[in-house]
C-alpha cells in the first residue's frame, strides 16, 4: 500500500481544518567581531577574576557546531595565557566520536579545534572521576583531566535535544 493510500484510509473519518503556509522570520543580531565582543564580556566576568597565574584551566568543548568556535576558543585561550594560566582543551561530548579519546579529538579537529591553531594541548581521555550520586542513586561522573584542573570553562551551544524532551536534555548539563 502506498503512503498516500494509507493516510487517506487512516484519515477517512477525520475532519481536518484548512491549512495555510506560513513563514516566520526573526531578527538575528550578528556579531561583527566575535573576538572583541568576547574579550569585552570576559572583562566583566567575576569567575575570570578567580583565575590566577599558573592555574590550570580545562576548556570543555562539545561537538555542537558553533559559528566562530575556533575564534571563541582562541580568544579565551589568549586571555587565559595573558593571566599566566595554563589552559588546555578537554572534549566534552558523551558518545560522539565513537566514545573514544581519539574519536573525540577527531570531532574537535573537524570543528577547527586543533593544537596547532590554538597553541594548547587537547587532552582527551575516557577516564572519569565519580563526584557524587544523583537523587535517584546513579553515579555522577566527570572527565578526570577536567576534575584535576583548577578551573573548568565550558564552551557550549544550548539547544533542545533532538530526540526527547525532559527537565534535563543535552548539552551544557552533560558537559559539566
Region spans (language model):
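Gly/Ser/Thr-rich active-site loops/lids in small-molecule metabolic enzymes
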Residues: 174-176
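An acidic, phosphate/nucleotide-engaging active-site surface
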Residues: 103-168
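Short glycine-rich or small-residue beta-strand-to-loop segments that form or flank ligand, phosphate
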Residues: 56-65, 88-95
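Histidine-anchored nucleotide/phosphate-binding helix
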Residues: 67-87
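Short glycine/serine/threonine-rich phosphate/pyrophosphate-binding segments
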Residues: 66-73, 98-99, 161-164
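N-terminal amphipathic/basic leader segments beginning at the initiator methionine
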Residues: 1-37
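Short connector loops at secondary-structure junctions
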Residues: 90-106
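Glycine-rich phosphate/diphosphate-binding loops that line cofactor/substrate pockets in enzymes
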Residues: 42-58, 81-82
Amino acid at each position: 500500500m502506498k503512503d498516500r493510500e494509507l493516510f487517506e484510509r487512516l484519515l477517512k473519518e477525520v475532519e481536518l481544518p484548512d491549512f495555510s503556509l506560513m513563514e516566520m522570520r526573526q531578527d538575528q543580531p550578528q556579531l561583527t567581531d566575535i573576538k572583541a565582543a568576547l574579550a569585552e564580556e570576559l572583562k566583566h566576568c567575576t569567575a575570570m577574576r578567580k583565575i590566577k597565574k599558573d592555574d590550570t584551566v580545562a576548556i570543555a568543548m562539545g561537538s555542537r557546531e558553533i559559528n566562530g568556535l575556533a575564534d571563541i576558543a582562541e580568544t579565551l585561550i589568549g586571555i587565559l595565557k595573558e593571566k599566566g594560566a595554563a589552559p588546555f582543551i578537554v572534549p566534552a561530548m558523551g558518545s560522539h566520536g565513537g566514545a573514544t579519546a581519539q574519536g573525540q579529538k577527531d570531532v574537535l579537529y573537524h570543528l577547527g579545534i586543533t593544537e596547532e591553531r590554538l597553541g594548547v594541548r587537547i587532552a582527551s581521555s575516557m577516564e572519569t572521576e565519580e563526584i557524587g550520586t544523583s537523587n535517584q542513586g546513579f553515579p555522577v561522573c566527570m572527565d578526570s583531566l577536567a576534575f584535576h584542573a583548577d578551573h573548568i570553562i565550558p564552551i557550549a551551544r544550548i539547544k533542545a535535544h533532538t530526540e526527547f524532551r525532559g527537565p534535563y536534555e543535552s548539552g551544557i548539563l552533560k558537559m559539566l
